[in-house]
C-alpha cells in the first residue's frame, strides 16, 4: 500500500503560495491498477514526483515499502547529449540492473528505435524519447510503475505494445 499523510505542496507565485495539495490523505491499494485523472495543471505530475520522492512536499509524507519507478513522462529521464544506448546503460546502472548487456538489448528491442538508438537523444522526436524512457522503465522490475502520459504517444502499434506491457506487469 502507498499511504499519503497530510500531504501539502505549494509553489511560490507573485500572489503568494499556490497550493497544489493541502493536507491530502489517501491510501492507494497496490494490488490493483490505479488511474489518477484530472485536468491539466491539477497536480497529477506533481503527485507522481512526490510518490517517487523526486520532489518533496512542504508538509506531510508518503509511506510505502514497495519499490517504485521514476515518473515515466514524455520528456523525463534522459540526457539529450547522450545516445539512446548510453542513456539505457546509465538508467540500468543507477537502478542496479544485474546484466546490463541483456537489459540494453531488451530496451533496444522494445523501444523500436533501430539505428537511432546510437544517436544523441537530442535528435529524437518527443515520441522517440517517450519510447526510450518507457522501454527503460518497463525492463526493470519495480513493484509500482508511475506512468504519466507516456502511453499516449507513438504509433498505434507501440501504444498497444505499451498497454500490453503494463497489463503483463500488473499480472505478475
Model regions and ranges:
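A short, flexible loop at the N-terminus of ABC-type nucleotide-binding domains that lies
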Residues: 1-4, 8-31, 35, 58
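Conserved catalytic loops of ABC-family nucleotide-binding domains
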Residues: 165-172
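Short linear Ser/Thr-Pro motifs
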Residues: 25, 45, 125-126
Amino acid at each position: 500500500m502507498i499511504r499519503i499523510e497530510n500531504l501539502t505542496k505549494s509553489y511560490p507565485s507573485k500572489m503568494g503560495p499556490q497550493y497544489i495539495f493541502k493536507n491530502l490523505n489517501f491510501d492507494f491499494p497496490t494490488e490493483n491498477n490505479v488511474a489518477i485523472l484530472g485536468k491539466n495543471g491539477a497536480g497529477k505530475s506533481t503527485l507522481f514526483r512526490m510518490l517517487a520522492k523526486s520532489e518533496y512536499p512542504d508538509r506531510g509524507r508518503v509511506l510505502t515499502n514497495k519499490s517504485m519507478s521514476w515518473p515515466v513522462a514524455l520528456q523525463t529521464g534522459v540526457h539529450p547529449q547522450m545516445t539512446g544506448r548510453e542513456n539505457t546503460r546509465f538508467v540500468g546502472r543507477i537502478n542496479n540492473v544485474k546484466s546490463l548487456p541483456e537489459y540494453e538489448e531488451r530496451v533496444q528491442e522494445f523501444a523500436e528505435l533501430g539505428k537511432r538508438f546510437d544517436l544523441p537523444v537530442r535528435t529524437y522526436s518527443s515520441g522517440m524519447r517517450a519510447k526510450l524512457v518507457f522501454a527503460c522503465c518497463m525492463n526493470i522490475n519495480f513493484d509500482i510503475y508511475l506512468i504519466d502520459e507516456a502511453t499516449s504517444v507513438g504509433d498505434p502499434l507501440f501504444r498497444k505494445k505499451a498497454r500490453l506491457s503494463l497489463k503483463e506487469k500488473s499480472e505478475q
